[in-house]
Structure formats: structure tokens, C-alpha cells
């Protein structure tokens, strides 16, 4: 996941460290934790049969965030803008499959007119 961090930081963005992707299994937020920052060689070795989410949060400002009093809403500590996306990925014998990509490569909801 190191490459996401390097790419974002080259563009002067930051990767939130307080949240991560997660495994999908018997429970929704399962093992492993999928960090979106770090150094090459750190983290868990991915193995065939693992299913997990990749869901980085990328901030215009600093990577620090805080959770509001409702216990759910997260905001950037410096009030900068942030974006988040998510994909579900499975590790296969020959590599990986991204299950949340559209077969028709939709980049916006198909019911909306361009």
C-alpha cells in the first residue's frame, strides 16, 4: 500500500493514518488490517484466498483527523478537504481481482446523463 502514499505525497496530499482497509470474512471488519501508508516490506504478506477492502482517505492538508461527538463523523484536524474511495479485492492464484469495478467500466451512475 506504500505506492498510494508515495503517489499522494508527490502531489502534496496526505494519507490518513487513523483508518485503514480491512479483511472480509466471518465478520465485516475482519483480519487483516490494510494500512495505506508505511514502508516497503512492512505489513502482512497477502495470500491466495484473502478478501479485503482498500479504502484510503486522502487529505489536501495534514493527515490527522478527529472523530466528532456523534462517534462516527470524521473530519480533518486542520479543516482541509478529504476524499475517500473503496474497492473490494481478492487475492487469486495468479494475482488479484477487484470485485467493485464495473464490468462496463462505468465511472458514474449509469442512470445519470452526462
Describe the residue ranges of each PLM region.
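Acidic/glycine-rich phosphate/pyrophosphate-binding loops and surrounding catalytic core
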Residues: 6-20
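Short, basic/aromatic beta-hairpin or loop at an interaction surface
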Residues: 21-34
Amino acid at each position: 500500500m506504500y505506492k498510494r502514499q508515495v503517489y499522494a505525497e508527490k502531489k502534496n496530499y496526505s494519507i490518513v493514518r487513523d483508518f485503514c482497509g480491512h479483511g472480509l470474512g466471518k465478520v465485516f471488519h475482519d483480519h487483516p488490517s490494510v494500512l495505506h501508508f508505511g514502508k516497503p516490506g512492512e505489513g502482512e504478506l497477502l495470500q491466495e484466498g484473502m478478501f479485503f477492502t482498500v479504502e484510503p482517505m486522502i487529505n489536501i492538508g495534514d493527515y490527522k483527523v478527529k472523530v466528532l461527538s456523534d462517534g462516527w463523523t470524521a473530519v480533518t484536524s486542520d479543516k482541509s478537504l478529504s476524499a475517500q474511495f473503496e474497492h473490494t479485492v481478492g487475492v487469486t492464484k495468479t494475482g488479484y481481482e477487484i470485485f467493485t469495478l464495473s464490468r462496463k467500466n462505468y465511472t458514474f451512475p449509469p442512470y445519470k446523463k452526462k
